[in-house]
């Protein structure tokens, strides 16, 4: 087999359907668009959500809630991520340098997801009750 002899499998490729090319083709004249109406015309499609002039559903329903801007300043780190980090002392700066939290993060909390076997000393980082128990059980501390 040579590269210049490679072909698609038989029946894998077929010519595209050419519509509007005479009644003998079976899809001539109206070309599968039916008779008259907006959808039969060239460029005859409305934008998504348009309901013919009726107030669209998206605008009929009221707005709800808001997007908290505090989310970009708060971050969570799992015990599994701490385990893989492999540092004895962890603070916010170390987590930022490792890429575990964003550069804008001001508040970081450790959550109990996964296992921790190494002793880790946390400074300036919060922890949930379960995470704190797991860190202290592994010989670490939370300050």
UniProtKB/Swiss-Prot annotation:
Q: Which Pfam families match?
A: Ribosomal_L27A
Q: Look up the record and give one Gene Ontology term from the biological process aspect.
A: translation
Question: Which InterPro entries did the record assign?
Answer: Ribosomal_uL15, Ribosomal_uL15/eL18, Ribosomal_uL15/eL18_sf, Ribosomal_uL15_bac-type
Output the SUPFAM superfamilies linked to this UniProt entry: Ribosomal proteins L15p and L18e (SSF52080)
Tell me which UniProt keywords the record has, alphabetically: Ribonucleoprotein, Ribosomal protein, RNA-binding, rRNA-binding
List cystine links: none
Q: Protein name, please? A: Large ribosomal subunit protein uL15
